[in-house]
């Protein structure tokens, strides 16, 4: 898969993207060089991963979508939704006008804020608090150093399911608003995958075969 790399020359003095707009919907990976601050796009719809290196963040007037992961050295912000087939990780905050959805984990050095729901296939971790207009759900743990809010939408009266926080376990944080439902962590499957064995003086790494 092809990787496009954006540098300072692709942005104007206001950090707005001025390059080829075909990159906004690109069938490949997108990388943004370090130390650019928060760079701004109309939207991003990337087939592969999006990576903004150290001290670079991403802001989109509309949505941000990646078939794989989204990672930024600083913040990630979208006027509508943020969606990744894999994980979403930001050195500072993650904020979306609509929902935030990740196939694996969501991790922010600061806060996580969504106008609608927050959903992760793995865990959710925030250096500050977590705020969602609707539900928060993940399969593993939720960790927050501060408070957690779910169901803060102002465009309707939230139903019970709109303010439910579903997770395997609440590892840290205070539920300030919302209904916590801890469903238990999935059992760890015993596997030899990745283990190193030595046979006749030679080392081999085991790989589990799919049935």
At which residue positions do the language-model features occur?
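Intrinsically disordered, low-complexity terminal regions
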Residues: 1-40, 45, 57, 93, ...
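Thr-biased low-complexity repeat/linker tracts and other Thr-enriched repetitive architectures
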Residues: 56-134
């Amino acid at each position: 898969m092809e990787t496009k790399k954006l540098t300072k020359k692709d942005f104007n003095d206001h950090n707005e993207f001025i390059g080829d707009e075909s990159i906004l919907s690109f069938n490949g990976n997108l990388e943004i060089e370090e130390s650019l601050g928060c760079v701004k796009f109309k939207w991003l719809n990337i087939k592969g991963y999006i990576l903004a290196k150290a001290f670079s963040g991403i802001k989109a007037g509309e949505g941000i979508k990646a078939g794989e992961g989204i990672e930024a050295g600083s913040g990630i912000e979208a006027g509508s939704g943020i969606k990744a087939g894999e994980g979403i990780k930001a050195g500072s905050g993650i904020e979306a006008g609509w929902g935030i959805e990740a196939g694996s984990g969501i991790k922010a050095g600061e806060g996580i804020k969504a106008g609608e729901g927050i959903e992760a296939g793995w865990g959710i971790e925030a250096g500050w608090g977590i705020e969602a207009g609707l539900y928060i759900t993940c399969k593993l743990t939720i960790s927050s150093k501060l408070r957690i809010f779910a169901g803060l939408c102002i465009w309707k009266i939230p139903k019970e399911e709109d303010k439910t926080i579903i997770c395997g376990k609440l590892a840290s944080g205070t539920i300030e608003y919302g209904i916590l439902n801890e469903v238990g962590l999935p059992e760890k499957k015993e596997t030899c995958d990745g283990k190193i064995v030595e046979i006749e003086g030679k080392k081999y790494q085991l790989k589990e075969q799919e049935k």
